[in-house]
Amino acid sequence: MAFSTYLGSLESSLVLKGLAGVWLVWYIGRVFYNIFLHPLANVPGPLLCKFSKIPWDYWQWTGRLPQNTAKVHAKYGEIVRIGPNELSFTNNAAWNDIFAKVPGRAQWPRHPKRVPQGKNGPQSIMNTAGTYHARFRRLLNHAFSEKGLQEQQDLITKYIDIFVSKVDGFARTGQSLDVTKWFVMVGFDVISDLGWSEPFNCVENGEVHEWMKTFAETAFDTQLKFLFRERGLMFLAPYLVPMKLQLARLNNFKYARARVEERIKTGGTRGDFWDKISVKSAGDNASGEGLTKEEMVVAAVTLVGTGSHTISTLLTGLAYFLGTNPHTMKKLVDEIRTSFNSPEEIDLVSVHKLKYLTACLNETMRLYPPVINMLWRTPPQGGGHASGIFIPEGTGCNMSFFGIAQNPDYFTRPLDFCPERFLPDPPAEFRDDNHEAYHPFSLGAYNCLGQNLANAESRLIMTKLLWYFDFELDGTVDKDWLDQKSYGVFIKKELPVKFHPGPNAVRHVANGNGVATNGHANGHANGHARINTK
């Protein structure tokens, strides 16, 4: 009996060892194939990245993928292999070959496993393609066009003026305010009113709405689930992704659903972004030209998230760079204060003449892009060519914004904040900079729909702030402030800033042009702010 038990145990041991041996041979063969025989074998990159996704997964999990990818580019060149089936690019040719819309050429689709998914599966403008994507764009194109935004100028200006009056209160008392939080609140108030004619009054109340608090954690949750989805392990996500992140995502969709359900009841007569969606989507999209209710929920999440955080990232980054570059700050302040004689002259059209402000915003996006690591594409069926190499179907392809920005072959003094490089007639030092490598809102049919809103709102906010106030960074600002984690978007650190009344603020107070002490700008009816006199 004992002998037969021993034989059974021996047989089990041999089976396990045999299986382990088979797996080891298979794994060694796979490693050998990925390094030496794979279609991407000749693309340079770290050895471990050629046969394992462990580095990529770790960088993604820790929020350091953009920074580490840039380091790989600095060492290995413009085209690098950062995973067995993942490539990253920093050259002009890749923008044209992968992202540009060229007649007669198949569009490179978004990578199916690296795009956000709705809670219940519906697609959003972030992850659609072809006619499906075109349907989303048609519904929102006019709203986000320059003409559409000008039609909403009074509404946009109203919330910016409330913010200006709040800043005045801080300036008069010498208190610092965290512009990271306040810029998000301004963007959130604007997009909520544009989207649903239902403002959250975050700036007026000085409080972050609960919905806003879910976005950073939702971004983290989304990026982590990419890792599980790619490996067919989504069934493990509920157990391994922190519950705090999962609850944030659920709450994000809960708030969106509540807004959508309320907005459906009012129909398409409110004059906001949602009017056209409401009309075309009647009867749960019976016409096929609108959105189903579930698609509306996903669209609402996308609209609010990108409409507030994209703008706040751009403005917060610019505030940091201005605060750490006094010479640039002075040049921008001089441009703004010599361009306008009164606040009534500052509007969505007039701010476009500010060349140096435009250059400052472009330089901010070069060094601190509002959206990062969200451009994954994959070749069309049968594979495709990009940057002179054949890329097999199923390969993940991305542009490294940091790799582009930090490349001295593209930009002179690449790590320095130099807005002059983006002036229409730049100094000789910057005339050889490669602006064709710079596309912060992506390129082609899937470029960022909200870029006009981000540019317009950012210009208007910064112009009004610097027309009235001087500012400086609080002494408590982290010297490594730019070193931030990112999960599709940056997880921004606090940026405390001290504002001081400038000459225009003092002059307006002396002339009695003030705002009410409750923080409402007297000029709301015509869209212009007044400084508080009390």
Swiss-Prot record:
Q: Does the keyword Nucleotide-binding apply?
A: no
**Which Gene Ontology BP terms does the record give?**
terpenoid biosynthetic process; viridicatumtoxin biosynthetic process
**InterPro entries tied to this protein:** Cyt_P450 (IPR001128), Cyt_P450_E_grp-I (IPR002401), Cyt_P450_sf (IPR036396), Cytochrome_P450_monoxygenase (IPR050121)
- CDD domains recorded for this chain? CYP60B-like (cd11058)
Q: Which Gene3D superfamilies match?
A: Cytochrome P450
Q: Supply the EC number(s).
A: 1.-.-.-
User: What cofactor is needed?
Assistant: heme
Specify which residues bind heme according to the UniProt entry for this protein.
C448
Domain of life of the organism encoding this protein: Eukaryota
What does UniProt report about how this protein is used?
Viridicatumtoxin and its derivative, viridicatumtoxin B, exhibit anti-methicillin-resistant Staphylococcus aureus (anti-MRSA) activity. Moreover, viridicatumtoxin and a C2 acetyl analog, spirohexaline, have been demonstrated to inhibit bacterial undecaprenyl diphosphate synthase, a potential new target for antibiotic development.
Quote the disruption phenotype from the UniProt entry: Impairs the production of viridicatumtoxin, but accumulates previridicatumtoxin.
The UniProt similarity line reads: Belongs to the cytochrome P450 family.
Q: Which PANTHER family match?
A: BENZOATE-PARA-HYDROXYLASE, CYTOCHROME P450
Function as written in the Swiss-Prot or TrEMBL entry: Cytochrome P450 monooxygenase; part of the gene cluster that mediates the biosynthesis of viridicatumtoxin, a tetracycline-like fungal meroterpenoid with a unique, fused spirobicyclic ring system. The first step of the pathway is the production of the malonamoyl-CoA starter unit for the polyketide synthase vrtA. The aldolase vrtJ may be involved in the synthesis of the malonamate substrate for malonamoyl-CoA synthetase vrtB.
What's the name of the protein?
Cytochrome P450 monooxygenase vrtK
Species this chain originates from = Penicillium aethiopicum
